[in-house]
Amino acid sequence: MAQSKENTATSPRSKAPAAEKSAAAPAAQAGEKRPRTTRRPYYNRRPRRPQQPKEAAVPIHIYPLGGLGEVGKNMTVYECNGDMIIVDCGLVFPDSDMFGVDMVIPDFTFVVQNKDKIKGLLITHGHEDHIGSIPYLLQKFDLPIYGTRLTCGLIRNKLEEFGLAGKTKFVEITPKQKIKLGCFTIEPIHVNHSIPDAVAFAIDSPAGTIIQTGDFKIDYTPLACGVTDLSTLAEYGQRGVLALLSDSTNAERPGFTATEQKVAAGVRNLFARARNKRIIIATFASNIYRVQQIIDLAVEDGRKVAFSGRSMVNNTAMAQELGYMHIPEGTLIGVEELNQYPPEQVVLITTGSQGEPLSALSRMASCSHRQVRVGPGDFIIISANPIPGNEKSVTKIVNGLLLLGAEVIYESMYDGHVSGHACQEEQKLMLTLTRPKYFLPVHGEYKQLKKHALTAASLGIPTNNILIAENGSNVILTKDEIKLGEPVTAGAVMVDGLGVGDVGNVVLRDRKHLSEDGLVIIVATVDSKTGKVLAGPDLVSRGFVYVRENESLMDGAQSIVENALDRCVEEHVRDWNSVKTRVREALSSYIYRRTKRSPMILPILMEV
């Protein structure tokens, strides 16, 4: 019973006096925390800490305005936190059905609408498909251009033709130099390509790091400038790359791209084969490495060197001025001096490797070059493979040169060209080094983009993290997702002479129509009150038939027009558009029955 009373006395629930409770309290707290028996007053309560909302991931928008689904016209806009930058601004040469068009450039509507947000234009390298549209963009608004030394030099040359070089701000950059533009920090990374000073860009933003490779390959024995900076690419891969935008040009080709050293061996053998003949070599004017190789071989062989073609002359002059090309004193001569030397003592380096109609080699093949006449004493080398779509043009030039008696070496007849773009194994290495979360294949037709996407998937990148975008896509990236937003304006703007954008699909359709079936013009003078024919109708044709051999056809056509005009008078048709339509339809039907052709018919009715 005593034990029971003791327990009752120390129990928290016992009704013992207050003094007895306070005496027992220390014993109760010795081994454990005393439970609270009262609540704090509301005015003394500790407020609950509000739960912090999860911070929204910062998005970055990528807007490709060119270069997807096509080879050329490369242009990409990045936007983050209200700041924008542009990478590249190139052109593409017209398809064969774009009659009279000189070049095609991106649609600048979107960038003009956002010009106040744009902090600068960054250029990966100096090829036309990456710099060719810059003059047309600068005609819209001014912005600073960031590029390596040679790239800026080539752009400056181009802008001088447009009178824009003096007022354009150029910022020369070097690999590993950080550039701060708004919320973006950009680092150029050296890559191999068929032109010196090519770079990729690592673009840091609050959303993460994006790497855009530009045009690249991985050449372990390059002629100059060193190997692609694989260590910097790997460092970014270790830190974490949000997305990779990579060159897809050679995505269908297995293996590695051959080294430029291979070309030197092939051309050296051809120099020996030429013996006592004059050597003419056509190559890309922008391929400074290739031109330097040819110059070095010419010096070894004791030959003088001349250049032909405006872009070849301009590019080589710029490369010499900036120290990218070295020509021994006394080696370079003018093209007008070629005939002052024996054939075995000269080499002519020229444009025209892609069969361009107005190029120097094309003019030689058509005997319209003012200084150079091709004949049996010439040994001609085309040191480039035809770009898809140019095969017929190149073949036409080769045939023309052969007919003149020259010996012509082209395409697969020797190792005279290697690509400047990465093949599958190099693309895999780029993906493996950078380890991107998201992958966007760029710079290629759809089949090449698709193949590059499959290559990325084979390396373990989830298919949900691979996106084949289109020109005008609004690609939205965060650390958590990749998605498409509302598309922006993008497309092709055709340049014809001084006209920019004034040639559209309707004009091209008319030009195609004229090229296929020709033109027939109807000229008649009619009374403005009665509609009766006062003079004519006369018919004039161009590109339709040879009139002297088709007089019966043209006489019949004139009768058809007269009858159509008479019926309009009889039926009191006074609306001149209706009259023209009736005449056009009647003549078109007659001509098609007689010839199975549909020339463009243009009625001209003059009222008196």
Range-by-range predicted roles:
Residues R40-L122, H127-Y341, S359-R373, K392-K396:
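His/Asp/Glu-rich metal-coordinating catalytic cores
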Residues L68, V92-D102, P106, K117-I118, ...:
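A glycine- and charged-residue-rich anion-binding loop/surface
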Residues L159, A456, I591:
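Conserved hydrophobic residues forming the short capping helix/wall of the S-adenosyl-L-methionine
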Residues T174, E470-G472, R597-I601:
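Short Gly/Ser/Thr- and Asp/Glu-enriched loop/turn motifs at secondary-structure junctions
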Residues R253-S383, I387-G556, I560-H572, K580, ...:
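Hard-cation-handling environments
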Residues H572-V608:
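C-terminal tails and terminal domains of large nucleic-acid-associated
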